[in-house]
Amino acid sequence: EDLHQITRIIKKHYPGLPYFMLGHSMGSLAVRCYLKKYDRELDGLIVCGCPGKNTMAPLGTALIRMLQTTKDPHSKSRLADSIFANMFDRPFRAENLIHAWICSDRKVVETYNKDPLCNFTFTLNGYESLLWLMRQTYSRMGWRVRNHKLPVLFVSGASDPCLGGSA
């Protein structure tokens, strides 16, 4: 619904212009959830770096909810970070570089790692929201497709660990 509010604001300020949406990674989940209900609002959609369906999402949700019984939902958890955030680094352990999975160019990853705006971890609520988006994205429930001619571009790397590819 947040994306729909943004859509309404943008269309009010820029009436008559085509409206495209781009979602990357977690944002790709959000735009696909948006698409279920508001496909008529869009003139085009670009979906990039799409996380694949994760059959462990219900178990992850249960773990996060269990952790929230003892911690504030807006607090961080090393356990949750080690399970969720670090799972993409595991195939790249030999490179001895955190976030090596984001790019094959080591210098790009080093620059990313030094940027304080890039080095954050989710709160428990953030992980729960991510898992909710994943479940909603891959659920067959709730689709009200009305814009059958909507152009949609999906872009992902063949070895993207988010998509389930092997590095």
Question: Predicted segment positions?
Answer:
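Acidic catalytic loop of the alpha/beta-hydrolase fold
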Residues: 119-120, 159-166
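Short beta-strand/loop motif that positions the catalytic acidic residue
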Residues: 154-156
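Short, proline-enriched alpha-helix->beta-strand connector loops that line the catalytic pocket
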Residues: 146-152
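Glycine-rich nucleophile elbow surrounding the catalytic serine of serine-hydrolase chemistry
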Residues: 23-33
